[in-house]
Amino acid sequence: VQDFKREAVRHAEEEHPKESAGLVVNGSYFPCRNIAPDPEANFVINPVDYARAMLAGTIEAVVHSHPQGTPVSDHDRKACRQTKLLWYVYSVPDKQWSTIKPS
């Protein structure tokens, strides 16, 4: 298991039942605050956290959790394409990872 995933799982468990959100920066997990109006259904990374991540190094991927175990959504796929970054989605109840690649 990639090291960042251990930290991301811990963050997802701490944030449950809300979606956790973070970034992979230089191979390490960078937790971010989810400022979505409905954080149990989706996520929006706090722009201050995103800026701090950019200053810390190269943003390599977006990470977020699905607290209810729902599969990767069409919205996730579309957002992944828009960011042009790899996305990792962690299903909390299933303890399973999904990866989305930008196309």
What are these regions (language model features)?
Residues V62:
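Cys-dependent condensing catalytic cores that perform Claisen condensation/acyl-transfer
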Residues V1-I59, P67-S103:
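Conserved beta-strand-loop surface patch within small alpha/beta domains used
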